[in-house]
Amino acid sequence: MFSPGTMVEVSSKINEGEVVWVPSMVIKEFKEDDEYKYIVKDKSFSCEGKKARPNKTVDLSSLRPIPVSVDEYQLEENVEVFLDGMGWRHGRVMGSQERAIGTLSQKWYFVRLESTKKQLTFKQSDLRPLKVWEDGVWKVLQTRELSFTQGSGDKTGDSVRNANESDPPLTPPPGIITPPLKQIEAGTQRKALSKKTLPRNQNGSGNDSTLENENSEDNNRKRKREENLGCVASVEQDKPKDTTMVLPFEKKLRIWETLESMEVFKTVPQSPHFSPLLVESREDSREMSAVGMMLTFFGLLDEVKALQHNDPISFFISLTNSFAELEKHGFNVKAPQSRINKLLSLRDRQSKKTEELKDAEKVTAEKESVKAENKRKILELQRLNEEMDKEIAQSKSCAAKIVQQLDDVKLEFLATASAPW
């Protein structure tokens, strides 16, 4: 199940039934009528300056964990794309292009949205393989329409299948140890294997004579290493605890000494196996790829430490996805992932408290306004009372004069009546 604070995706329907998967966070899990329910908070617009959506309650069938991306996508492959900060939508790869950004080159993809048939451009980080979360496992949608295959009677609807059931297991080259519990994702295997086969003993290739002439000593060392790897592989099942992990390349670069002497390497020791490089990279580039991953890992640790409370939620999700990619290569990412989840939970608490503060300030402002209005009314009543006092004083003065006049009339009346004839 999904515990509170877990980043998930929630299905939402738009445009007459199109399903969009929206980044969200689980706030609370509870049971209702023997069925698990979840209160989730929408994270798609949290930092985009738009009004936050209210929390909503969904059932388990509307939730899924966050799937990971891959390094490359094929033409006509079904994918999901992150569009307009709203959520992940179904599309199809129509082409790709390398673009230079400063000194770096980045791959962009042309994707046609299945719902609108519009073709848009996305960077690689905004793409993911199209997968279905069923019965607690990921099921992969085949990357090409079956209509491309001649003589096939299958329907497109049958293209959803369990990758672990239908894909043959990936067998590494002789002598290479694949550490347990570090399986290469089936979707990635199919793509990589479609591009090239796994490297085998190089002595049978057409260029061996040239390589031996250039550097026979290196070839001898290479054959010796392969023999040693074969010996290690043959006893792997008998001695699982004593097996020494063998990398898919030989450490030749001096930068390894620098990396292993870094303080962060001692604080957060790592023993990556880099086994996916067997299918993702050429043999001559594996070591450089591994060094790049080591530097990336340490750089990501620094980015986690530098996170600010007002950073976009998408940045947190990007870090989580990056660590998930490194985990495939054997990196221990439990600590940074746990810290990111904790920070996301704190961000959610901060958001709640911010809303509570706004509500409290609004109530205070309303009360202050009522108080000011009452004070204004009091002052107005005081002014009216003062004017009334003046009018009362004038009335009393007038009444006193009238009383005096009545007395004068009375005296005159008596004097007149009693006057002699």
Curated annotation (Swiss-Prot):
Keywords: Coiled coil, Growth regulation, Nucleus, Transport. One of its GO terms (cellular component) is nucleus. The keyword Transport applies. Residues 361-397 form a coiled coil. Residues 149-229 are annotated as: Disordered. Expressed in leaves and flowers, and at lower levels in roots, stems and siliques. May be involved in the polar growth of plant cells via transportation of RNAs. This is DUF724 domain-containing protein 8. It comes from Arabidopsis thaliana (Mouse-ear cress). The gene is DUF8.
